[in-house]
Amino acid sequence: MSKGLPETRTDAAMSELVPEPRPKPAVPMKPMSINSNLLGYIGIDTIIEQMRKKTMKTGFDFNIMVVGQSGLGKSTLVNTLFKSQVSRKASSWNREEKIPKTVEIKAIGHVIEEGGVKMKLTVIDTPGFGDQINNENCWEPIEKYINEQYEKFLKEEVNIARKKRIPDTRVHCCLYFISPTGHSLRPLDLEFMKHLSKVVNIIPVIAKADTMTLEEKSEFKQRVRKELEVNGIEFYPQKEFDEDLEDKTENDKIRQESMPFAVVGSDKEYQVNGKRVLGRKTPWGIIEVENLNHCEFALLRDFVIRTHLQDLKEVTHNIHYETYRAKRLNDNGGLPPGEGLLGTVLPPVPATPCPTAE
């Protein structure tokens, strides 16, 4: 508009159409690292001691499931793992006892205390799995049980008058026992792990590894890893859950070298070079359970108990349970389980059907 000339309506309208300049978005400030030594002691590091004291006072839950054909030493291995009779003895099994016609779920609870810390351990056994002539869909009762524990936890979680500490019966770890054939995995092995790895942390183990030579064991481990990779089966610890480079480096070594753990279990002690050791007596000598030159039991124990126990619990809660919870609430219109949109009762999420395996 020319200087000195009155502003017209057109000029005014055009000026209204011109957008005002947008303010620049605020740049988020990077967190500053402050050396507390300059300010005096604060006490942040005491949180670790606070957590330790609370854990010692309340204890913690750990629920482990064992799955595999009968005769693979599942009960013996779990007893060896926790150095307690936490599962029924293999020696107490009656040879005349009938094999269950269907898969059964048996949970046994124990309290183990070590160094002032109490662990409320539950061992879930699955007698009858894989022992039938027709093993079609024999994993469904196991998946149903796992989902039922998620359902129990969810109902307590959304309860208005919920308990201060919700009882945790969710399965944190599933040890899947592979028969030491030295050849390849059975279709049932592949179908079980492919299906159940989506709902629980599966750790594959080769049972009774002392029946194979070192060369046979190494080749079988490589073959199992290859078959799992080809079939798109991810076992714990899954790559996608690695939180940082340190986790990735540590877990890659486990995934590429240790898995599946070739183990031997025994609750019997023998004298070897003046020391009492857990082992199995064979015509060729004593197989020492905790000797890494003999088997990988010590690696499995360290992995499950000493380095990854807390992570097993966290992945169960943050990944598997949250997946179930989101699906359950989504199917229920966002309402608590048990109530539909019009007050109708909804059934629990059923086991997902999967391909036939014999």
Curated annotation (Swiss-Prot):
Keyword Cell cycle carried by entry: yes
Tissue: Brain-specific.
Name of a matching Pfam family: Septin
GO terms, molecular function: GTP binding; GTPase activity; identical protein binding; molecular adaptor activity
G1 motif as annotated region, ranges: 68-75
Alphabetic keyword roster: Cell cycle, Cell division, Cytoplasm, Cytoskeleton, GTP-binding, Nucleotide-binding, Phosphoprotein, Synapse
Transmembrane segments: none
Composition-biased stretches (Basic and acidic residues): 1-10
Gene Ontology BP terms: cytoskeleton-dependent cytokinesis; protein localization
Coiled-coil segments on the chain, per record: none
Post-translational modification: Phosphorylated by PKG on serine residues. Phosphorylated by PKG on Ser-91.
Assembly information from the UniProt record: Septins polymerize into heterooligomeric protein complexes that form filaments, and can associate with cellular membranes, actin filaments and microtubules. GTPase activity is required for filament formation.
Family affiliation: Belongs to the TRAFAC class TrmE-Era-EngA-EngB-Septin-like GTPase superfamily. Septin GTPase family.
The protein's name in its UniProt record: Neuronal-specific septin-3
Organism: Homo sapiens
Gene (name only): SEPTIN3
